[in-house]
UniProtKB/Swiss-Prot annotation:
Family affiliation: Belongs to the ABC transporter superfamily.
Gene responsible for this protein: ywjA
Domain ABC transmembrane type-1 residues, every copy: 16-299
GO MF, one annotated term: ABC-type transporter activity
Protein name in UniProt: Uncharacterized ABC transporter ATP-binding protein YwjA
Domain ABC transporter: 333-567
Record-annotated membrane-spanning stretches: 16-36, 50-70, 132-152, 154-174, 243-263, 264-284
Secretion signal, residue range per the UniProt entry: none
Annotated keywords: ATP-binding, Cell membrane, Membrane, Nucleotide-binding, Transmembrane, Transmembrane helix, Transport
GO cellular component terms, A-Z: membrane raft; plasma membrane
Binding-site residues, ATP: G366, P367, S368, G369, A370, G371, K372, S373
Species: Bacillus subtilis (strain 168)
Alphabetical GO biological process terms: transmembrane transport
Membrane topology annotation: Multi-pass membrane protein
């Protein structure tokens, strides 16, 4: 894990060494102060040479000025190093998340992933700056201070250093406990973020059902668990801090008592005694730094472990080494003995065989859960078939690059996702870099002109979080405009009009028919009236493809489609 962590320093070697050696130089200057005080008391005071005293004072001031400059470098440039590494890691993680399939997101909470991208990486950034530097300098300062102490009085130095093994043992002990505590804390932060994200994202549903009290109770459970975990980690920190404080102050008292005895015996001068006490304080500073590391390291370690677990999650759907870019596909689709299950225990689709001709409109109907949407989701490789193969124009979709395959397929869903931003940005998402002329052409084709002209800022009107300022029909038209701009060879309409009123549905259907012209179109619908003009209707059940044919042929066959049609239109007449 350390090798993986330090690999992120490679692009910033110069910055790392600037920060590292500045911190080392600053630490060495700290050691010089007690020696200069010793020189003042034992040499300059008895000699009463004001010229030498002033010269030494100026030299000490220069040391302090240089130390201040080094402190600035360590604080600013050192944090720049940490921020750069944090930024690189966040970019790598975000890029990696773009490669993961729908299956991964089906099994992971959005709030947890958000926490990994934000909180975890902030802790890692702090460790990247302070970690190696602080640990090395702490050890170096302790050894340097001990060396000077030995030079002044080796007996007192050895007596003072007896306490160090206890301090080191405590550091290792509390570091282990803190790592465990912060691993749990990071998980709780993820759950906490997921709860808040769910509530805020679904606030309209919460208020519509009047379930605010229920949501408060659920939030209180997560909030309390987060509180308890955080308190337990701070309890460990408090124990570590208080015990370390007691030990270091005991050492100070010990040095004062023993040092006084050595002075009275005449084996230690006054200047050496004061220098020794000051060196004891220099010795404590890295111990305090080690305590800070004990608090910081576990957060960073837990965050980095979580980061690496996510980075090591291999995309289950990715380009094969021999995959090639495709363009200008006609849209001849063939499913050959295709099976698929969302888990290893149950298949949604079993041994599906289906051929679709280029330019053909094929509608999929059947009971919920039979696999209609799943069948279509396998085509752009949102999910991977567990058995069999799917080809387009005779080429296996596994032999096409994902970007070029998905560039040839457009999906219009019932639940349209829109980004926070303007109408223009959401339409242009269909083809990044599209010209103004192309965007307006798509607006006209989707019958969005009236909406755009009625908006206060036209195409530059902000539509709110996920398009909250637009109606369902307006969202659908915007989605269709986006698809006109993309201009795919193959179109998937996933229950695109099932939640709209009759008038809006008719307008959307007209736009969809225009969009479907000349394209291979796969339609998933519950409302059979919308697909009676399809070239072919495929009835999908839990047993696979039950029957297929044109609307009238299936009605006359008296099979499942006929019964579904009779049940649906019988209900409509009854109503």
């Amino acid at each position: 894990m350390l090798r993986q962590f330090f690999s992120y320093y490679k692009p910033y070697k110069t910055l790392f060494f600037l920060d590292f050696f500045s911190a080392i130089a600053g630490g060495l200057m700290e050691l010089s102060f007690p020696l200069i005080v010793n020189y003042f008391i034992d040499t300059l005071l008895p000699g009463r040479d004001w010229g030498l005293i002033i010269a030494t004072s100026i030299g000490l001031f220069a040391v302090y000025a240089l130390s201040s400059a080094l402190q600035y470098i360590v604080t600013y440039w050192g944090h720049m190093l940490g921020i750069n590494i944090e930024t690189d890691m966040r970019k790598s993680l975000f890029d990696h998340l773009q490669k993961l399939s729908f299956k991964f997101y089906d099994n992971n909470k959005t709030g947890t992933l958000m926490s990994k991208l934000t909180n975890d990486l902030m802790y890692i950034g702090e460790v990247a700056h302070h970690g190696p530097e602080d640990l090395f300098i702490a050890v170096m300062t302790i050894l340097g201070a001990f060396g000077v102490m030995l030079f002044i009085n080796w007996q007192l130095a050895l007596l003072t250093f007896i306490i160090m093994p206890i301090v080191i043992w405590l550091a290792l002990y509390f570091n282990k406990k803190m790592t465990k505590a912060f691993t749990t804390l990071n998980k709780d932060i993820g759950d906490f973020s997921a709860r808040v994200e769910n509530n805020i994202g679904g606030i309209r549903l919460v208020q519509a059902f009047g379930n605010e009290a229920f949501e408060k109770e659920r939030f209180a459970v997560n909030n309390q668990r987060f509180r308890v975990t955080k308190l337990s980690s701070y309890k460990i920190m408090a124990k570590n801090g208080s015990i370390s404080y007691m030990l270091t102050r005991f050492v100070t008292l010990f040095v004062l008592l023993c040092g006084t005895w050595f002075v009275i015996r005449g084996s230690l001068s006054y200047g050496e005694f004061v220098a020794f006490v000051l060196l004891t304080n220099v010795l404590f500073r890295p111990i305090d730094k080690i305590n800070a590391i004990i608090e910081m390291y576990p957060r960073g370690i837990a965050g980095f472990k979580s980061y690496m677990e996510l980075m090591e999650t291999e995309p289950d759907i990715q380009d094969s080494p021999d995959s090639k870019d495709v363009s200008g596909l006609k849209g001849n689709i063939r499913y050959k003995h295709v099976s698929f299950g969302y888990d290893d225990h149950h298949n949604v689709l079993n041994d599906i065989n289906l051929s679709i001709q280029a330019g053909e409109t094929v509608a999929f109907v059947g009971p919920s859960g039979a696999g209609k949407s799943t069948l279509c989701s396998l085509l752009p490789r949102f999910y991977e078939a567990s058995e069999g193969d799917i080809t387009i124009d005779g080429i296996s979709i596994k032999d096409m690059t994902l970007s070029s395959l998905r560039g040839q397929i457009g999906v219009v869903q019932q639940d349209v996702f829109l980004f926070s931003g303007t109408l223009r940005e959401n339409i242009a998402y269909g083809r990044l870099g599209a010209s103004e002329e192309d965007i307006w052409q798509a607006v006209k084709q989707a019958h969005l002109e009236e909406l755009v002209h009625n908006m206060p800022d036209g195409l530059d009107t902000m539509i709110g979080e996920r398009g909250v300022k637009l109606s369902g029909g307006q969202k659908q038209r915007l989605s269709i405009a986006r698809m006109f701009l993309k201009n795919p060879s193959i179109l998937i309409l996933d229950e695109a009009t099932s939640a709209l009123d009759t008038e809006t549905e008719a307008a959307i259907q007209k736009a969809l028919q225009e969009l479907s012209e000349g394209r291979t179109t796969l339609v998933i619908a519950h409302r059979l009236a919308t697909i009676k003009d399809a070239d072919r209707i495929v009835v999908v059940t839990n047993n696979g493809i039950e029957e297929q044919g044109r609307h009238q042929d299936l009605i006359e066959a008296g099979g499942l489609y006929s019964r579904l049609h009779q049940a649906q239109f019988g209900q409509m007449v009854h109503r």
